[in-house]
């Protein structure tokens, strides 16, 4: 072995020996493992550092000092550092937190004293849903399904926007589709399994329905369009539709040529390689007759029409507190298991406490409101209180663009908590629109039974109405 290699080897051995000696002679308790044990459990050396967490600036609303069971709405707008306090319940929250959430959801921060136990989540803001964006700035969609509201097993919702001339491409799906036009105008088109055709133009407030499996297309007219889609399957996804582009892209060109009567293979050279979903297109002709294509089977009979011009219909019920406009298979037969109500609630008024016997409800706020059962809020600000049996009850807050879902038989009310009208749609999977009004129920029950059960006086029970009130003035 060369002398320089031998010298380097000897030096390495000496260094290793020195490290071993240093390690064996190290003072006890200086290693990382040993010192960390002094932080486990009680040790008088680990003194507590007291901090005054109550020393925060905040203010309470007058309603927060009332009996918690009164449960008045808490408007935290302009309130300094809102706190989770109701009557004698709750306590201070020094943070960390985002007070914007508390302002939007005051009944989560400081719930009424009547809330109790657990109720499955019944609210989802579509603004928190992932937006699926179309091509060429032609539009977008966002959805709510069981991924967002797990209890919403019967229905799912999609909010879709098409810019002027924009298409929702030719497609079909395994779920039935019920739709309400929120704003703008749209041309809808479909072909049945018998070869009958359908085309119509719809405006804000109108409704359409396509049965499961029926292919259809949508195109926005001048000014664009936005609409709510409700599907009869809580797990429905916009990503699971059957698309015309994919039908052509996923079949061999030779088969396409045979299928269409011997067209040359070159006819398929420029078909899209995948989905278009939402894309810009040639503006629809002003004269709808130009797109009224008819084969030997003719057009769909009027009584089986896929559209209903609900915007032209009168309100079903008008009260001092608002109005209700009902559409169900009695007036729109093709939608055999979709019933809905467009509800307007004036500030301070309440959609009376009720429940649905036939189905769950999905609700959505439209312009500034909400939907129940399956509901969608169009406009306004509201809260829904849900009683779910076994002593369980919970209150949820809703704003424009929010969805709600209330399972069958659970009582609920919708209270307008803002200064503008609340407008929402409640959609049922039912062959007619119906509910059980708590007010009418006790009003039509012998007074003695009600007084004995609820410990109420005769003067109180005598004020109960024998007819549904639908929307009660605040």
Task: Cite the ranges covered by each PLM segment.
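Active-site-adjacent segment of 2-oxoglutarate/Fe(II) JmjC oxygenases
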Residues: 224-285, 421-474
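Fungal secretory targeting signals
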Residues: 1-28
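Ligand-binding loop in jelly-roll beta-barrel domains
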Residues: 26-29, 34, 203-204, 209-244, ...
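A short, N-terminal "cap"/entry segment at the start of jelly-roll beta-barrel domains
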Residues: 26-154, 258-342, 456-474
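Glycine- and acidic-residue-biased ligand/ion/polar-headgroup-sensing regions
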Residues: 164-167, 172-194, 347-392, 400-402
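Short coil/turn segments at secondary-structure boundaries
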Residues: 172-175, 191-194, 222-223, 232, ...
């Amino acid at each position: 072995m060369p002398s320089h290699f031998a010298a380097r080897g000897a030096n390495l051995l000496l260094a290793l020996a020195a490290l071993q000696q240093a390690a064996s002679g190290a003072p006890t308790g200086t290693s990382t493992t040993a010192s960390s044990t002094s932080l486990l459990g009680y040790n008088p050396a680990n003194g507590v550092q007291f901090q005054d967490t109550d020393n925060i600036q905040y203010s309470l609303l007058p309603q927060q000092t009332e009996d918690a069971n009164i449960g008045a709405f808490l408007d935290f707008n302009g309130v300094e550092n809102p706190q989770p306090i109701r009557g004698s319940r709750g306590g201070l929250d020094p943070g960390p937190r985002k007070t914007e959430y508390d302002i939007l959801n005051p009944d989560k921060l400081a719930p009424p004293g009547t809330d109790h136990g657990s109720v499955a989540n019944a609210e989802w803001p579509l603004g928190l849903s992932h937006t699926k964006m179309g091509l060429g700035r032609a539009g977008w969609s966002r959805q709510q399904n069981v991924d967002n509201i797990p209890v919403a097993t019967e229905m799912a919702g999609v909010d879709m926007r098409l810019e002027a001339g924009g298409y929702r491409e030719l497609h079909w799906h395994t779920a039935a589709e019920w739709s309400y036009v929120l704003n703008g105008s749209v041309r809808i088109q479909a072909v049945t399994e018998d070869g009958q055709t359908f085309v119509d133009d719809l405006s804000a407030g109108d409704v359409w329905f396509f049965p499961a499996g029926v292919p259809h297309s949508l195109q926005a007219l001048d000014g664009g369009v936005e609409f709510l889609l409700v599907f009869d399957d809580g797990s429905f996804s916009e990503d699971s539709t059957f698309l015309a582009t994919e039908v052509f892209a996923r079949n061999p060109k030779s088969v396409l040529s045979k299928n269409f009567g011997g067209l040359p293979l070159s006819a398929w050279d420029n078909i899209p390689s995948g989905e278009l979903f939402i894309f810009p297109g040639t503006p629809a002709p002003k004269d709808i007759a130009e797109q009224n294509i008819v084969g030997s089977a003719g057009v769909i009979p009027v009584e089986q029409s896929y559209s209903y011009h609900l915007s032209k219909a009168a309100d079903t019920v008008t009260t001092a507190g608002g109005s209700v406009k009902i559409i169900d298979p009695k007036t729109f037969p093709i939608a055999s298991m979709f019933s809905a109500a467009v509800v307007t609630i004036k500030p301070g008024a309440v959609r009376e406490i009720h429940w649905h016997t036939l189905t769950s409800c999905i609700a959505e706020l439209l312009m500034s409101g909400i939907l129940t059962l399956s509901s969608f809020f169009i406009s306004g600000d509201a809260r829904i209180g849900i009683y779910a049996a076994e002593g369980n009850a919970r209150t949820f807050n809703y704003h424009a663009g929010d969805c709600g879902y209330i399972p069958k038989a659970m009582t609920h009310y919708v209270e307008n908590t803002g200064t503008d009208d609340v407008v929402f749609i409640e959609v049922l999977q039912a062959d007619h629109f119906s509910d059980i009004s708590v007010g009418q129920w006790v009003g039509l029950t012998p007074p003695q039974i009600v007084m004995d059960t609820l410990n109420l006086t005769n003067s109180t029970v005598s004020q109960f109405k024998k007819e549904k009130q639908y929307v009660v003035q605040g």
